[in-house]
Amino acid sequence: MTLWLGIDPGADGTGIALIRLTPVPVLLDHDVILNDTSEVGTVYIARVLGAIDRIRCGHFDATNDSGRPRMAVEAVNSPTGFAAGKRHPIDPAHLLGCAIVLGAVLAAYPDSVLVPPGGNGHGAYASYPPELVTAGERRRADWATRPAGQSTTIRHARSAFDVARQGPSCARRARLAHLTRQEPLL
């Protein structure tokens, strides 16, 4: 049984999702930590790291380290100034806030796997566990095939769920890149 903890770091909210990897991933626990202020400070960082510890340690035996979940964290892209093919102004505070949360998580858990951003949390609603789809999102007749939206707080947990699902493949790619990288001879 392999457990993966996915984290979607953000300035306004951070999503956390713990899954058991099976042919159909099973959501074991999730949380969304919302930032109550307009800035990313030590209180928010402490709340994020506390929630990660609570979820992570609640699902394995810490005395012998058996079954410890692997961690996958969504990385941050360089800003492009475009969103959905249109010019989009960039809020530097939001980008810096995401980077601060990402840095805090990586400092606390340096063995985390980085997952590239892009598309996380935007799969069809039916691809997510029922806990990650609100009743309002299920109202339309075609809800199951629609791509997940950005209108609810739970979107952060959906993104973390996708990050956790991608963790193993990103870890394999990182290992292969390390093995095939030629180091200069001394």
Tell where the protein language model's regions lie, with residue ranges:
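Phosphate- and other anionic-substrate recognition elements at nucleic-acid/protein interfaces
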Residues: M1-L186
